């Protein structure tokens, strides 16, 4: 294991790779059992709401001239199931992504430097039996959710917070007031 938390720069975007193991760039992810299944089954390319594939392929790209990285086209996620302690190594070939990485990064920088998007994603039902509406998973992690939803209310459930945008039935759990 080498190159732990080395600072990387891809066309002005900075980050830290977790490690280089046996010459391969590796990113460690702790996750729920649900998310772990995607890593275990190698399905992250099909369902990647947090952009992990882009992140890891960027680390692989940044290592193209690094002598620690001997595998210049592959990267792996070392995924750890937080609930059960299971571990798996999910390896990806990034040959195709690496061809367009410079353009991808420049487009991302341009997007981030621009204005915040005006269109917000539609809320989803809180559950099959509730008439409340909540933020979808991607929006629930966004730091700008308050900007999009002025009347957003946060309720704390045993499994974590839920961000409700429409409350028709008052939840019987604590609410966080900000």
Predicted regions and their residues:
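A short acidic, glycine-rich active-site loop
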Residues: 42-54
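Metal-dependent nuclease catalytic regions and adjoining charged, substrate-binding loops involved
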Residues: 46-48, 62-178
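Short amphipathic alpha-helical face segments that pack within enzyme cores
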Residues: 54-62
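Extracellular structured ligand-interaction cores
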Residues: 14-16, 23, 72, 139
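Glycine-centered tight beta-turn/hairpin loop motif at sheet-sheet or coil-to-beta transitions
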Residues: 12, 21-23, 84
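Conserved catalytic cores of phosphodiester-cleaving nucleases, focusing on short active-site segments
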Residues: 17-43, 59
């Amino acid at each position: 294991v080498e190159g732990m938390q080395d600072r990387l720069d891809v066309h002005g975007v900075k980050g830290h790779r977790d490690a280089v193991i046996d010459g391969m760039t590796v990113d460690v992810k702790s996750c729920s059992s649900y998310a772990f299944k995607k890593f275990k089954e190698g399905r992250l390319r099909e369902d990647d709401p947090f952009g992990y594939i882009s992140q890891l392929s960027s680390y692989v790209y940044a290592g193209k001239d690094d002598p620690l990285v001997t595998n210049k086209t592959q990267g792996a996620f070392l995924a750890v199931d937080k609930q059960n302690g299971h571990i798996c190594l999910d390896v990806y070939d990034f040959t195709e992504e690496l061809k367009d990485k410079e353009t991808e990064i420049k487009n991302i920088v341009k997007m981030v430097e621009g204005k915040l998007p005006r269109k917000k994603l539609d809320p989803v039902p809180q559950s099959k039996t509730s008439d409340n509406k909540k933020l979808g998973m991607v929006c629930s992690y966004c730091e700008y959710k308050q900007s999009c939803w002025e009347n957003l209310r946060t309720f704390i459930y045993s499994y974590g917070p839920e961000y409700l945008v429409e409350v028709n039935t008052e939840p019987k759990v604590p609410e966080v007031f900000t």
